[in-house]
A protein has these predicted regions:
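Gly/Ser/Thr-enriched, mixed-charge loops and adjacent short helices
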Residues: 2-130
Length: 181
């Protein structure tokens, strides 16, 4: 599982900055963690967030402008047998897309196993087989994705940046006239 690891998030729900992650990594070096003893009175409590998937789905859908419709749009969603296996299909289907889902049967060992953004071939083939207009393949922890068009052609991060830049330019939002990726 070399492509996956632990992610820490701050109280705002976003990933920690690199400096904070570096400090945490230093604590995890052999011999360091064992020497740290926490005062039981200072340790917080963990609790289960009821309906976390539902709440996250609502948040993700709120990021899509209401004017953007997915009704009847045929998509392939490859969840890499990982973190996106429940949420991604739910979000796209609730937005109205007609989805075909692959990589949504994690067993604890098959994450990224010849599937997902690091192995987009199955997504590309499925797009062609079902006649989808596009496909999205996430990596195991769902912090990256790669896309393909209706012909199975890969749309990578540079392509996405170019598409976003052209959109921003058309709306007068690209202030400097350039994008650095």
């Amino acid at each position: 599982y070399s492509d996956n690891g632990i992610k820490f998030f701050g109280p705002d729900g976003f990933k920690l900055d690199d400096a904070t992650e570096d400090e945490i990594e230093k604590l995890l070096l052999p011999g360091t963690l064992e020497s740290l003893k926490a005062d039981p009175g200072l340790i917080g409590k963990s609790y289960r967030i009821e309906d976390a998937i539902g709440r996250y789905t609502v948040f993700l859908k709120s990021c899509i402008p209401a004017s953007k419709k997915f009704e009847g749009v045929k998509l392939v969603v490859d969840a890499a047998n990982g973190a996106a296996h429940k949420v991604a299909p739910l979000v796209f289907s609730e937005l109205g897309a007609d989805i075909t889902v692959i990589g949504n049967k994690p067993d604890g060992k098959n994450i990224n196993d010849n599937i997902g953004s690091t192995h987009p071939g199955q997504m590309q083939r499925t797009v062609l087989e079902v006649g989808a207009v596009a496909g999205v393949a996430y990596d195991g922890d769902a912090d990256r994705a790669i896309f393909c068009d209706e012909k199975g052609g890969i749309v990578d991060g540079d392509d996405v940046l170019a598409i976003l830049a052209l959109d921003m330019k058309s709306r007068g939002k690209l202030t400097k006239g350039a994008v650095v990726g």
